[in-house]
Amino acid sequence: MVEDNVRIGTLIDYWMKHNEEHAETYMKWAAKAASAGNEKLSRILVRLYLESKRLNRLFEAAKKAHC
C-alpha cells in the first residue's frame, strides 16, 4: 500500500533521529560515570553509544532501500 510505504519512510527518519538522541545521552552519562569513578559503567555506556551508531548505519541502509 502507498500509505504504508510513506509511513515506513517517516518511521525510519524518526527512528534514526531518536536513536541518535539516545546515543548522545549515553556518551554524556558515560562521562559522568567515569567522573564518579565507575569505569565499568562508563565502558558499558560507551559500548551502547557505539552500538547505537552501528544501528544508525543500518537505518541509513533501510532508508536507501526504501527509496
Protein language model features and the residues they cover:
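Short, charge-rich amphipathic interface segments used for partner binding and complex assembly
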Residues: W29-A65
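N-terminal acidic leader/helix
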Residues: M1-W29
